[in-house]
Amino acid sequence: MRDKRVSVRGNLVRDMMQNVMETSLKQPIQSGELRKNPVEPAWICPAGYEYEIVETEQFPMEYLRPEGIFTGRVILQLHGGGYIGPMKNIYRKFAVRYSKLSFGGDVLTIDYRVAPEYPYPAALEDAVYAYKWLIQEKEYEPDHII
C-alpha cells in the first residue's frame, strides 16, 4: 500500500526492504540463526598482546594481557548483547582499549551462555564462575578485579 505523503523513492525503498525482509531474512530472524551464527571475520590479536581462549565446561572465556607486563589488575568484561547475543569482535577491541586505559591491565571477557537456550540465571552463574576463576586460577586479589 502506497502512502501518498511519501515520495516515490521512499515508497520504492520501503517496498524493496519489505520484500527482502519477507523473503531472505524472515526465517533467519525468527529462528535465531542470525544471532546464533554471526558472520564476522576472524579476530587478530594486536601486536604487543597475548591472547588465550579458555574453554570451560559451559562457556568460553578470552584472556588478553600485554606482553611482558603484569600489573596485578584485571578487568572482567561482560560484553553487551542483552544476555541474548554472543560476543563479537567489537568487544575484543574494547578489551584492548580497556587494557591500554588501565595502563597494562589484563582483561578477561566471557562469552556467557545466552537466552533463550540458557535462561536466567545462566549468564549470572557464568560471571560468578569467571570471577572465581580469576581468583583461584590466576591468583588475582579480589580488590584488583574490576
Regions found by a protein language model. Give the residues of each.
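A glycine/proline-hinged amphipathic helix-loop "lid/cap" segment
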Residues: M1-P66
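Proline/glycine-enriched tight loop/beta-turn segments at coil->beta junctions
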Residues: P66-V74, F103
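Short beta-strand element of the alpha/beta-hydrolase
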Residues: G72-G82
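Serine-hydrolase catalytic-loop signature spanning alpha/beta hydrolases and amidase-signature enzymes
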Residues: G82-I90, V107, W133
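Short amphipathic alpha-helix adjacent to the substrate-entry channel of hydrolases
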Residues: N89-T109
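Short beta-to-alpha linker loops that shape the active-site pocket of alpha/beta-hydrolase fold enzymes
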Residues: I110-A115
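Alpha/beta-hydrolase active-site loop
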Residues: Y118-K138
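Alpha/beta-hydrolase fold nucleophile elbow
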Residues: K138-I146
